[in-house]
UniProtKB/Swiss-Prot annotation:
InterPro entries: ConA-like_dom_sf, Galectin_CRD. Gene3D superfamilies: 2.60.120.200. It is an enzyme of class 3 (hydrolase). One of its GO terms (molecular function) is polysaccharide binding. Anti-tumor lectin with DNase activity. Inhibits the growth of several tumor cell lines in vitro. Induces lymphocyte infiltration and necrosis of tumor cells in a mouse tumor model. Induces apoptosis in HeLa cells. Binds N-acetylneuraminyl lactose (N-acetyl-alpha-neuraminyl-(2->3)-beta-D-galactosyl-(1->4)-beta-D-glucose). This is Anti-tumor lectin. GO terms for biological process: apoptotic process; positive regulation of apoptotic process. It comes from the Eukaryota. The keyword Nuclease applies. Residues 12-155 form the Galectin domain. Its EC number is 3.1.21.-. The keyword Hydrolase applies. N-acetyl-alpha-neuraminyl-(2->3)-beta-D-galactosyl-(1->4)-beta-D-glucose binds at N43, H59, R63, N72, R74, W80, E83.
Amino acid sequence: QGVNIYNISAGTSVDLAAPVTTGDIVTFFSSALNLNAGAGNPNNTTLNLFAENGAYLLHIAFRLQENVIIFNSRQPDGPWLVEQRVSDVANQFAGIDGKAMVTVFDHGDKYQVVINEKTVIQYTKQISGLTLSLSYNATEETSIFSTVVEAVTYTGLA
């Protein structure tokens, strides 16, 4: 219980020392924000929360070329479920110059996703379970975030 800090390089994942469950929080901190990375490539930067079985409990994809943030879930080897979209990516990062903070609050039946202190979505969970690992991925070195993001979990708060 308490606070755990993880450094996640692009293309890698980390196992959590304590699972994230209802009432807990995950925050991803990036020391850089590159909203010009999308020219000519799909620029799909993703942050993911995984269950023990490898299910994507929450998949957050920042797609600059399409100018959307996609939220979705899927079971291992299963299809993606019903995606939810928030448009105007750059506008969602207003407020903190040159840096990014993406916070996920686990409310039990939904995830509240806050970007730079502004709620962008209340995502109704399509798959339930404890978050036991996190990942950070980016297409071809064109992440909108820094090469390493810091993830902080706040657990046992409830």
